[in-house]
């Protein structure tokens, strides 16, 4: 499926297993889209046998999220399957996961403008890990 490249000074990054996708996820995606002039990249994450597997395999979750935003040029949906890229389970798989993310970034973003990435996370563990690797990370209050 063709996705136009995102263009802007900043791009939001939202990732999760989306098992299942719910209103809280949609609110985060809309916030990232609103706060970044270039829109946002949504990454559906998972691995073979993850928590969503019994009802919604990773591939199906990715397809649902991608179809939901198919007509939105400011939301670019991608997939990272930890098993397929050989990443160890969290918290040990960040290096391979980030390598895969960097590949996606180059495919999804018009990089000649050198936009900033702004990460949106709702889990303090992810926040702490990402703050060591990336500059702009927002920890969301999941109770709001």
Go through each PLM region and give its residues.
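Nucleotidyltransferase catalytic core that binds NTPs
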Residues: 1-144
């Amino acid at each position: 499926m063709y996705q136009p490249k995102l263009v802007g000074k900043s791009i939001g990054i939202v990732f999760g297993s989306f098992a299942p996708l719910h209103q809280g996820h949609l609110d985060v995606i809309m916030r990232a889209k609103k706060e970044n002039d270039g829109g946002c990249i949504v990454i559906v994450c998972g691995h073979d046998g993850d928590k969503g597997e019994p009802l919604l395999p990773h591939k199906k979750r990715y397809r649902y999220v991608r179809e939901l935003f198919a007509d939105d040029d400011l939301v670019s949906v991608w997939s990272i399957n930890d098993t397929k890229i050989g990443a160890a389970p969290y918290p040990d798989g960040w290096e391979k996961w980030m390598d895969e993310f960097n590949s996606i970034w180059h495919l999804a973003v018009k990089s000649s403008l050198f936009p900033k990435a702004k990460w949106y996370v709702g889990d303090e563990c992810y926040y702490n890990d990402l703050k060591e690797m990336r500059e702009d990370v927002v920890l969301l209050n999941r109770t709001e």
